[in-house]
């Protein structure tokens, strides 16, 4: 009996958990700067955000997060938005609730709107006029991780983003990493115009193909963006290029010095060899310890070698050449 009781307790708790709405909502009271949680009810398979007669009149904001949108879809539970109540809020946060079109709540954007968070929904198209209104009013707007698609329907928005040239060019890489920041520094788009998660250059070509007929100016802007992107990419490589060029110059200088030294060495050796054998002089160097003395002999062939190693100032005697020997011989004859 105890096991059966425990089984039914777990079964009942599981069914109760599935019946409970998978949405957590809070309202914000600006007087004490506090968020208060309130329950969301399902009426006729429909959830209305914000809920009727649940939020006090002095609430300044609404925040709802759908924890299990798959559960709501499987059970055919739809979400409707009460735009008449939304107009009274300055802070609207509807996260992960499967919103497919921003126009569902755009009618509830009042002039006092100061914050809009629609992250993790299923937005595919953002109307140009709605986004322009949010940006002009300097409203912090978070639209990232949606499913915005390429195509003609988003051409006005695409053109608007390209016109944000100063900011857009600076954040071009981040744009393709699912983020773009507008000039008011408060509006962010993540995963904008996914195009099947195409890389940056393919995205430009793909989206431009759809929008060039309606906005011819896009072609010029895309070329500017591409050139700017390439310039920014190359700027990051400048230090490496400088280092590589410097290393190349040093290695070339080293090789040049080595080559110059080898050439000079070879040239000096060749010059020394020529001066030793082909100088044209007839003087034969003698060993200092042995000289010839011609004081007592008239003829060179009868000269006697004398040892002068003991004398400090021993004379160095000139040795006659072969021609001189021939002349002396002819004289003798």
Curated annotation (Swiss-Prot):
Induction: Expressed in the late phase of the viral replicative cycle. This is Transmembrane protein I329L. Disulfide bonds join 195-237. Residues 261-333 are cytoplasmic. Glycans are attached at residues 32, 39, 44, 76, 82, 101, 181, 185, 219. The chain crosses the membrane at residues 240-260. Its main location: host cell.
